[in-house]
């Protein structure tokens, strides 16, 4: 048997360990601590009986109380949905102009539209709706297909160049690589860039004016401010959808790229489309 070590000062048995002359007393645990430990064991057993706790092969024990966090969540969702039913019904039934004119409905629609935007639109247009190369900035006042409430609603509902919707906006700029000479494409690129910036070659830009009038003005207008009815962009506002610079313009003239936006009406429904319309219009660029 091992010899017991007794502390001379207190008369209490020690653990037998010593660190730099310091010994640890082997006092028993307090009674209250022991009873607390027993209570926690009983509480754990009771919890395992009352609540889902024990994992099985394909499921788990349901517990005596039948509690479920998923059921609780569904109950909360149903409660939240029922409290919003009146607003949702009104938003689905009214026109976007009527919604925008009603302060309470407009506030509710903007909140709902912001939520729907983050889920459905932000992957392309960005969380702040500022867009990116090939994806329009929705905060400015430059709109290919119109920026009033009805125009925004139509674009969201039917999309752009979306094959699954016959009412989708559709416009295509033809490739001019086989129509114009290389020098002519450089001239018109310099001219377009020169509308808002200093062209790299003033002579090229001057010659490109006539090339523009002959080939581009029918869609973009003689003033190069675009035509909403055709989805032709304004080339005189220094806002660029694809990228900036004469080289970028030259590439677009030679072999244009066309973006596609899905039609959201069938996927989201009238209520969410109307909410998105109000939200996008309220970003600041709506006309």
UniProtKB/Swiss-Prot annotation:
Record-level GO cellular component terms: plasma membrane
Subunit comment: Component of the cbb3-type cytochrome c oxidase at least composed of FixN, FixO, FixQ and FixP.
One Pfam family of this chain: FixP_N
UniProt-annotated binding residues for heme c 1: 121, 124-125, 261
UniProt cofactor(s): heme c
First-listed, main subcellular location of the protein, grouped into a coarse class: membrane
Transmembrane region(s): 34-54
Topological region Cytoplasmic: 1-33
Gene source species: Rhizobium etli (strain ATCC 51251 / DSM 11541 / JCM 21823 / NBRC 15573 / CFN 42)
Entry-linked InterPro entries: CcoP_N, CcoP_N_sf, Cyt_c-like_dom, Cyt_c-like_dom_sf, Cyt_C_IC, Cyt_c_oxidase_cbb3_su3, Cytochrome_c_Oxidase_Subunit
Protein name: Cbb3-type cytochrome c oxidase subunit FixP
UniProt subcellular location: Cell inner membrane
GO molecular function, one term: heme binding
Residues annotated for heme c 2 binding in this entry: 173, 216, 219-220
Pathway note: Energy metabolism; oxidative phosphorylation
Single GO BP term: proton transmembrane transport
The encoding gene: fixP
Cofactor, how bound (note): Binds 2 heme C groups per subunit.
Assigned protein family: Belongs to the CcoP / FixP family.
Function: C-type cytochrome. Part of the cbb3-type cytochrome c oxidase complex. FixP subunit is required for transferring electrons from donor cytochrome c via its heme groups to FixO subunit. From there, electrons are shuttled to the catalytic binuclear center of FixN subunit where oxygen reduction takes place. The complex also functions as a proton pump.
Periplasmic-facing ranges: 55-287
């Amino acid at each position: 048997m091992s010899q017991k070590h007794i502390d001379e000062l207190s008369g209490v048995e020690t653990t037998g360990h010593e660190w730099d002359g310091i010994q640890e007393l082997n006092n028993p645990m307090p009674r209250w601590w022991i009873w607390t430990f027993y209570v926690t064991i009983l509480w754990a057993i009771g919890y395992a009986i009352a609540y889902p706790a024990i994992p099985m092969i394909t499921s788990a024990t349901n517990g005596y109380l039948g509690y479920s966090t998923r059921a609780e969540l569904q109950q909360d969702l149903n409660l939240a949905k029922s409290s919003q039913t009146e607003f949702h019904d009104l938003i689905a039934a009214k026109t976007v102009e009527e919604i925008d004119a009603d302060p309470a409905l407009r506030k509710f629609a903007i909140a709902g539209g912001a939520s729907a935007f983050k889920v459905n639109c932000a992957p392309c247009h960005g969380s702040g709706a500022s867009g990116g190369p090939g994806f329009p900035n929705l905060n400015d006042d430059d709109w290919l297909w119109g920026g009033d409430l009805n125009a925004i609603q139509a674009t969201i509902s039917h999309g752009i160049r979306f094959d699954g919707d016959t009412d989708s906006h559709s416009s295509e700029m033809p490739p001019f690589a086989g129509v114009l000479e290389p020098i002519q494409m450089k001239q018109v690129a310099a001219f377009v860039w020169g509308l808002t910036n200093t062209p790299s070659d003033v002579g090229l830009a001057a010659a490109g004016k006539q090339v523009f009038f002959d080939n581009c003005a029918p869609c973009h207008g003689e003033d190069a401010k675009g035509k909403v009815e055709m989805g032709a962009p304004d080339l005189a506002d220094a806002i660029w959808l694809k990228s900036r610079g004469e080289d970028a313009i030259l590439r677009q003239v030679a072999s244009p790229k066309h973006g596609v936006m899905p039609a959201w009406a069938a996927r989201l429904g009238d209520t969410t489309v109307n909410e998105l319309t109000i939200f996008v219009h309220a970003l600041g660029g709506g006309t």
